[in-house]
Amino acid sequence: MCSSDLHTGFTPGGAVDHDSLHVYNAARYAIVGMVARGQQQTDEQRAKVAAITVNLDSIRKARPARADSIRNGADDDGSGTVSVLEIAEYFAKMPQAKRPKRSLLFVWHVGEENGLWGSRYVTDHSPVPRESIVAQLNMDMVGRGEASDLPVGNPDYVQLVGSHRLSTELGDLVEKLNKDQRRPLKFDYQFDAPGHPENIYCRSDHYNYARYGIPITFFTTGLHGDYHQVTDEPQYIAYEHMARIDRLVASVATSVANQAKRPVVDGVKPDPTQACTNNGAAIRP
């Protein structure tokens, strides 16, 4: 992955292992790439980045082995992985004069299924000054969301989590940019409710950024019957639906990276030393 990413035009955020056969012999917490900022930026923009992230791992092989024992994870999280790669390539191919004024940091975390290992490591040992990250946009399972996947599903469906928790400004921006899309998506906020039994706010990589007071937005089309099953296969992905979510995330990243100032944090910051409890009040527009 890291070697092939070099061809999209963005800079790796660390040492590149060119032989994937050796990866399993060493600890790997994340793949990090950077799309350099454009021109004519202010000092505040020059020193800041926006992060677009995803988790790279699925839960892989089921036990005991049977005829089909490989959980390929097409949606969880192949969909998010390729989406972030596509967005990174879109910005990397852009002429520098047209690029956003802040740099964009693209991160593929590993170990999400094991307890958010990769995102915890990256946020504790950030490849850029942590205080320079103005916002984090997280994508995990963005390839389904149809009526056949969940009762409230439809071709415009996407769940948003955390978008108003730390920054009303960021949440409002996501709403505005969605309305500006040729065909707006329909946001479902029910899983963002504090105390929701699915506890989505605490279960994906965005939380390790939020615990340091970085405004986040989590995009997902939600759980479905093939979640963590051997049937999570590519033929069930709604590709155009996924592409529309990708376009919205790219639009949000562009806007955040071009703003004169970072999104205002007006929500309650979590204690980074404590476990996530999902009891804080979410701010709604």
Where are these predicted regions, by residue range?
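Alpha-helical metal-binding/catalytic segments enriched in His/Glu/Asp
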Residues: 16-51, 55-116, 249
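Stable alpha-helical elements in mature extracytoplasmic
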Residues: 77-83, 87, 100, 115-119, ...
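Active-site-adjacent bridging/hinge elements
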Residues: 7-9, 49-63, 220-228
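His/Asp/Glu-rich mid-to-C-terminal helical/loop segments that flank catalytic regions of hydrolases
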Residues: 220-285
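Short, solvent-exposed loop/turn and secondary-structure capping segments
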Residues: 9-17, 94, 116-120, 148-150, ...
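Short, small-residue-biased leader/transition segments that mark boundaries at the very start
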Residues: 1-3
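Metal-dependent peptidase/peptidase-like ectodomains
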Residues: 109-218
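Second-shell loop/turn segments in exported
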Residues: 15-20, 66-77, 108, 156-165, ...
